[in-house]
Curated annotation (Swiss-Prot):
GO terms for biological process: endoplasmic reticulum to Golgi vesicle-mediated transport; intra-Golgi vesicle-mediated transport; intracellular protein transport; organelle transport along microtubule; protein secretion. It comes from Drosophila pseudoobscura pseudoobscura. It holds the Pfam family Adaptin_N. It is found in: Cytoplasm; Golgi apparatus membrane; Cytoplasmic vesicle, COPI-coated vesicle membrane; Endoplasmic reticulum. The coatomer is a cytosolic protein complex that binds to dilysine motifs and reversibly associates with Golgi non-clathrin-coated vesicles, which further mediate biosynthetic protein transport from the ER, via the Golgi up to the trans Golgi network. Coatomer complex is required for budding from Golgi membranes, and is essential for the retrograde Golgi-to-ER transport of dilysine-tagged proteins. Required for limiting lipid storage in lipid droplets. Involved in the expansion of luminal extracellular matrices and apical membrane during tubulogenesis. It comes from the Eukaryota. This is Coatomer subunit gamma. It is a peripheral membrane protein.
Length: 878
């Protein structure tokens, strides 16, 4: 009875993990068993399992431990036990990246991969390729070629997949195996054919003509593997997108014809892949899309849950790009709302939300509410994203949608789920003025019982930004001050900042805010006390300019670049005053695009956004003498200076400093028989510019990206900074062996290569900024410290106000304010408000009044702290 009771208790506790309490030290000591003779296969398998478990649980072995374990493991090759041998292969693969001298087992693995025991061969190939590098690959090349065309499918697949892995480190050697891969394409085994196509494409993907020939050949043949056909469809789609075939020619394209014929394939997998590919292609018309949507509509009523899920997921993804076509499937989607598979039901209803009429919103929301509590957070986020899109489409329905979202906020859920809801409510508040009051009220209720610190801080920031301009700002004070009393120090500090914004923006509430901030000075936390004292001191001055600069429009510098600038200042001339205005601003928080693809929804933490300037700072810091230029003001996106398929490809990134520009040229040598040295770019400078330094690239081997720099000083006059530069790539060429990459001799010859011209524009020299309250900043700029330039233009190249706004934003490179970059439909008058900082720290505010009649008339007013900058920006439009 006692034994029965113990067994019953163990059963109640659930399954236990026999390896959960392993210690690395004791397991490594057990590896001594591997040296025993004869080999105890059963015991060794158990020890190897422990080692693999520890490694896969994240336990790290130092090189000495891994090497000792590896060499002990090699003794097990004397055993003929099949299971033990395969465990040894797994151990070799896991330890190969840490242990030293792993090539000692090459001969044993080569013997196994060429032996007669098929159970060994495939695993031996995988293990061998995990320890092989490009220097010793030629020794096993003959065996790899034989295995690729082996009659045993498992061996052939292992060789093909291992070849794909080796192609990343020894691409030149693997390219020589193309004939064997081509032969493997004729295999009757579906997996061999699939992997062979994958290897062939990888070998030829850098040669567009070779890929086109491969696809044209295979589309005319009949592939037996549905997996290979699916891959061929994807390759064909990539070629179509790269060629950018116009709509009227696309239907006659052999590639599109092939994809269309796959809609009639006998495999459901291929049919779906073809339909998915067609609906996601650009430049398609209704006639081309119709068969694909018919297939998806048919799959919606399939008895197989996988087909229903695939079809509705694809419809959900393209609902915003092809709403009319998806609407034809609405009846089928309505039927899927009650599907037993909740994932299918969720996708169906979110698709209907994206394409449905305004009158159906209430009915759909009622249907969602019946099962939303039963689905996972992952799919709840999909629902929230669909509601966000619906709010943008039907702003008058914000009350219904906001109430639904507030109900979801009160439910249980993880941080990412709650964040998606808060993001949506904030988006509605920012884009719909009518929804501001109700949105803020819902968020106030949420933070009363919010367990996520990051969300509470975000909401308090929003309340400080939007609350003072609501109809009755005083009603939010209680919610904010409650956080000071009840929350953690981080939230209390955010609440103090929010209170100060009410005091700065609402004179009627200033007296009460001063009392509350005075109480916060007694807080036990240093940060809270310091903030309260700081804001209290500023508010007591009753100076509007201080309110604007230090409370309403606080400096939002990039912390990484601010730290670097301060370190440089401390290492330099301390007598000179530190100028914070030259430090670039932090990346503006931009609302992420709504993902229509449910597979992209993930619970992984979001990495912090890094600006291009922060990314460039550490790399540029390695250049000699770069510190004297100051912090990076702006780094541009890369521009291509050559065609993508030329002998040498060069792209340029412009790093703008206060008085200098650093041209970064990323160079790639695509010729395997050439080794380049002393690579540099020679610029033809416009008048006023001066070259200060050229940093050449010493060596440029085949297929390695290397960088050369040119440092140029701007003219003293800002108006002369807009210019075009000629560029020539100069280098020394040495012939080399394509297999080794080593030059044949020490002697070379000088050569050059002409590059495309480059421009420095106004947008290159301006760092975007975002004003929380543009009108306050504009009014404050009406002073003697600010200078103004004004002009009127007729924009003949554009026909709509939205096109005009987009053009102005592109030319000037400024950040928009108050969502003025979006022009409401049906309007003939619009005002664009934007701001930024010119290199050197000159602030810029722009107000562009647009009127649409027969053309677009623009009245542009620019205010800046520098007259030359104001005139330069005005001239840029003309």
């Amino acid at each position: 009875m006692g034994s029965f009771r113990r067994d019953k208790e163990e059963e109640d506790d659930g399954p236990t993990n026999a390896y959960q309490n392993l210690e690395k030290t004791s397991v490594l000591q057990e590896t001594r068993t591997f040296n025993e003779t004869p080999v105890n296969a059963r015991k060794c398998i158990h020890i190897l399992t422990k080692i693999l478990y520890l490694i896969n649980q994240g336990e790290t072995l130092v090189p000495r431990e891994a090497t000792d374990c590896f060499f002990a493991m090699t003794k097990l090759f004397q055993s003929k036990d099949v299971v033990l041998r395969r465990m040894v292969y797994l151990g070799i693969k896991e330890l190969s990246s840490v242990a030293e001298d792993v090539i000692i087992v090459t001969s044993s693995l080569t013997k196994d991969m060429t032996g007669k025991e098929d159970l060994y061969r495939a695993a031996a190939i995988r293990a061998l390729c995990s320890i092989t590098d490009h220097t010793m690959l030629q020794a096993v090349e003959r065996y790899m070629k034989q295995c690729i065309v082996d009659k045993n499918a498992a061996v052939s697949c292992a060789a093909l997949v291992s070849s794909l892995r080796l192609a990343t480190t020894a691409g030149d050697v693997v390219k020589r195996w193309a004939n064997e891969a081509q032969e493997a394409m004729n295999s009757d085994n579906i997996m061999v054919q699939y992997h062979a196509l994958g290897l062939l494409y990888h070998i030829r993907k850098s040669d567009r003509l070779a890929v086109s020939k491969l696809v044209n050949k295979l589309t005319r043949s009949s592939l037996k593997s549905p997996y290979a056909v699916c891959m061929l469809i994807r390759i064909a789609c990539k070629l179509i997108e790269e060629e950018d075939i116009p709509s009227e020619e696309l239907s006659d394209s052999p590639l599109f014809t092939f994809i269309e014929t796959c809609l009639r394939h006998k495999s459901e997998m291929v049919i779906y892949e073809a339909a998915h590919a067609i609906v996601n292609l650009k430049n398609t018309n209704h006639r081309m899309l119709s068969p694909a949507f018919s297939i998806l509509q048919l799959f919606c009523s399939s008895p197989k849950a996988t087909l229903r899920f695939a079809a509705v997921r694809t419809l959900n993804k393209v609902a915003m790009t092809h709403p009319a076509a998806v609407t034809t499937c609405n009846l089928d989607l309505e039927g899927l709302i009650t599907d037993s598979n909740r994932s299918v039901a969720t996708l169906a209803i979110t698709t209907l939300l994206k394409t449905g009429a305004e009158s159906s919103v209430e009915r759909l929301m009622k249907q969602i509410s019946t099962f939303v509590a039963e689905i996972s957070d992952e799919f709840k986020i999909v629902v929230v994203q669909a509601i966000c899109a619906l709010c943008t489409k039907y702003p008058r329905k914000h009350t219904v949608l906001m109430n639904f979202l507030s109900g979801m906020l009160r439910e249980e859920g993880g941080l990412e789920y709650k964040t998606s809801i808060v993001d949506t409510i904030i988006t509605i508040i920012e884009e719909n003025a009518d929804a501001k009051e109700s949105g803020l009220s819902h968020l106030c209720e949420f933070i009363e019982d919010c367990e996520h610190v990051s969300l509470a801080v975000r909401i308090l920031h929003l309340m400080g930004k939007e609350g003072p301009f609501a109809a009755t700002p005083s009603k939010y004070i209680r919610f904010i001050y409650n956080r000071v009393i009840l929350e953690s120090p981080i939230v209390r500090a955010a609440a103090v900042t929010a209170l100060s914004q009410f005091g700065a923006s609402c004179p009627a509430l200033l007296t009460n805010i001063l009392v509350l901030l005075g109480r916060c000075q007694m807080d036990p936390d240093d940060e809270v006390r310091d903030r309260a004292t700081y804001y209290l001191t500023i508010l007591n001055t009753e100076r509007a300019d201080l309110y604007k600069n230090y409370i309403i429009e606080r400096e939002n510098c990039s912390l990484a670049l601010l730290e670097k600038a301060l370190v440089d200042h401390l290492n330099g001339d301390l007598e000179k005053r530190f100028d914070i205005s030259v430090v670039p601003k932090a990346a503006a928080v931009v609302r992420a695009e709504i993902s229509n693809d449910v597979m992209l929804v993930t619970s992984a933490p979001r990495p912090p956004k890094i600006t291009r300037e922060e990314e460039s700072a550490s790399r540029l810091a390695q250049l000699p003498g770069i510190q004297v230029l100051g912090p990076v003001h702006r780094s541009t996106a890369p521009i291509q200076l050559t065609e993508s398929e030329t002998e040498y490809t060069v792209q340029c990134i412009k790093h703008i400093f206060g008085q200098h520009v650093v041209f970064q040229f990323d160079c790639l040598n695509t010729l395997s028989d050439q080794f380049l040295e002393n690579v540099r770019v020679e610029l033809t400078l416009p008048e006023g510019f001066t070259t200060r330094a050229v940093v050449p690239c010493p060596k440029l081997p085949y297929n390695e990206l290397q960088t050369t720099y040119v440092i140029v000083e701007f003219p003293p006059d800002a108006g002369s900074s807009i210019a075009t530069f000629g560029a020539t790539l100069r280098f020394v060429v040495k012939d080399c062996d394509p297999n080794t990459g080593e030059p044949d001799s020490e002697e070379g010859y000088d050569d050059e290569y002409m590059l495309e011209d480059m421009e420095i524009t106004v947008a290159d020299q301006i760092q975007k900024s975002k004003k929380n309250n543009f009108q306050v900043a504009w009014d404050a700029a009406d002073s003697e410290e600010w200078l103004q330039a004004e002009d009127t233009f007729v924009l003949s190249a554009v026909t709509t106000l939205q096109d005009a706004v987009n053009t102005i934003m592109k030319i000037l490179g400024l950040g928009s304010a108050n969502l003025s970059e979006k022009v409401p439909e049906g309007t003939h008058l619009h005002t664009l408000l934007c701001s930024g900082t010119f290199r050197g720290g000159a602030e810029v505010l722009v107000r562009a009044k647009l009127a649409l009649s027969e053309g677009v008339t623009l009245n542009l007013t620019v205010r800046s702290t520098d007259q030359d900058v104001a005139e330069l920006i005005t001239a840029a439009i003309g």
